[in-house]
Swiss-Prot record:
Name of the protein: Polysaccharide lyase
EC number: 4.2.2.-, 4.2.2.3, 4.2.2.1, 4.2.2.14
Signal peptide boundaries: 1-22
Result, substituting H221F: Increases activity and specificity toward poly-ManA
High-level lineage: Bacteria, Pseudomonadati, Pseudomonadota, Gammaproteobacteria, Lysobacterales
């Protein structure tokens, strides 16, 4: 490299070095998770505020970590700053070394700890995917096995046939699919695809999901919530040149329209559940689906409420939908 070129690049190199030097130390990764269920009725529609706060406090370190790696990986996606990618990889590698979340899922009053691990895998696998092109072989050797162990631990939870494969199954599938994609693990990719397909197969002709219709006043909310990981999984499939949106004659479109119509007027949900629905503003899946829908204008009003952020879906969803989930093609 010539001296003039080196001098020209010096400010950029110094800025990146300074940013990486400023990367804060990650918190220690804990092996066990203790989360607390906070619904008081069988339908899962009535919240106990005290239990909800206890759960929020108990899981705050996990939520902060997820938000931090999402933010750092967003910085890389937005600016191509290698220091942001390296900080993300440093944090992921530290928790991999700690064996974070591979210990006991402590059952307090329900399976909330298992659900929390699923959401955390969603977050860390999506963050890793976003910075994958900056990971060197040594970093991949640290991080890949950890994510794969988490994914297989999450899948093992669903081996019990008594567990209801509702929105939690779809959210679990997202982390497994993202891990399969990021680590080039075909078995995990196929397992994630199976979770996606289960969600698509659950969609009725009227766009409803039977298990979410049983959620009383929160049925509309949980249709929106269940749709989010399905849309994100379809987006990950696009990175491999696959169109999962077309599955079962575009069944996902029926669900998306049912949710967006319900957010404007919940009368249909009120009638079919027998419960007045809590108000809903559609969540960040609209940032992607409005670009894929045959009638994207239906989702413009929801899009206008953005930008949308969700660490469990990867971070800044508006950024990811606009610029792509990854900067370079997957290896």
């Amino acid at each position: 490299m010539s001296l003039p070129l080196r001098l020209a690049l010096l400010p950029t190199l110094l800025a990146s070095a300074s940013a990486f030097a400023a990367c804060p130390a990650p918190p220690p990764g804990q092996p066990d998770i203790r989360a607390i269920g906070y619904y008081t009725d069988k339908a899962g529609s009535v919240i106990d505020p005290a239990l909800q706060q206890q759960n929020k406090d108990a899981t705050a370190p996990l939520d902060r970590y997820a938000a931090d790696v999402a933010r750092m990986s967003d910085d890389y996606l937005r600016n191509g700053d290698p220091a942001a990618a390296q900080c993300t990889l440093s944090w992921l590698g530290a928790w991999a070394d700690d064996g974070a979340m591979l210990g006991q899922m402590i059952r307090v009053n329900n399976d909330q700890s298992f659900y929390m691990r699923q959401w955390m895998l969603d977050a860390v696998a999506m963050a890793y995917l976003k910075v994958h092109d900056q990971a060197n072989p040594q970093q991949r050797a640290r991080i890949d096995p950890w994510l794969q162990k988490l994914a297989r631990a999450n899948l093992a939870y669903w081996d019990n046939p008594k567990r209801r494969r509702n929105n939690h199954y779809y959210w679990g599938g997202l982390g497994v699919l993202a891990t399969g994609l990021a680590t080039d693990d075909d078995a995990l990719w196929q397992a994630g695809h199976a979770a996606f397909q289960k969600g698509i197969d659950d969609i009725q002709d009227d766009g409803s999901l039977p298990l979410e219709m049983a959620r009383g006043q929160r049925a509309l909310h949980y249709h929106d919530y269940a749709l989010a990981p399905l849309v994100m999984m379809a987006e990950l499939a696009r990175l491999r040149g696959q169109d999962w949106y077309a599955s079962r004659n575009h069944a996902i479109d029926r669900l998306a329209r049912r949710v967006i119509e319900g957010s404007r007027d919940p009368a249909w949900f009120n009638q079919h559940t027998g419960a007045a629905q809590l108000p809903l503003q559609a969540s960040g899946w609209v940032e992607f689906y409005r670009l894929r829908s045959p009638d994207g204008g239906v989702f413009d009003a929801a899009h206008a409420r953005g930008p949308f952020h969700s660490p469990r879906l990867g971070g800044d969803l508006t950024l990811m939908a606009t610029h792509g989930i990854v900067r370079t093609p997957l290896r």
